């Protein structure tokens, strides 16, 4: 399966350098081409939506950008720097998988403190405020394994809100969210974009309507 790149929507170029630029990325599995070649960039103050059906390689792309997989060819520039190390990417990128990256035997609040110990968090935000934002104040001491799927998703959004990373990679963040959760995610994304952060998010279906500047990267099967 080969993914082709369709040019993003036309927008005036940003005066600031891209938060991330991908150059001729390719990836294959068992000698079968999966992705590429892909060329795109993510500017400060905007969201890039990666759209395509399930199985097309959206999650693979995010894992490559996050440094969890290696592309077969091409390279990625982070803040115009080539070949960044894993710690540098961790400081620059927050990756929210479609599977919650939570410690099941820690409480909701302990999970947020654990995140701080690993990566730090936004200097003007606290774990307690994050739990309030996502409506989990009453579950601060509840073990994650005792939370519902919806509550775990909200806790993941609290982790995201606390992240100091300027670039967010979000794998199908709107999946399984109720209308209130969609409003909450839009609020978090808007706050991030308005502070000149950048976001790349994936969707298998219709392009989500976001209250921020967006561009589109459409992946499809090669003819």
From Swiss-Prot:
Binding site for ATP: 52-59
Catalytic activity: heme b(in) + ATP + H2O = heme b(out) + ADP + phosphate + H(+)
Enzyme class, first EC level, given as a word: translocase
Entry-linked SUPFAM superfamilies: P-loop containing nucleoside triphosphate hydrolases
UniProt membrane topology term: Peripheral membrane protein
GO BP term (any one): cytochrome complex assembly
Ranges for domain ABC transporter: 20-222
PROSITE patterns: ABC_TRANSPORTER_1, ABC_TRANSPORTER_2, CCMA
Localization terms from the record: Cell inner membrane
Family the entry assigns: Belongs to the ABC transporter superfamily. CcmA exporter (TC 3.A.1.107) family.
Protein name (record): Cytochrome c biogenesis ATP-binding export protein CcmA
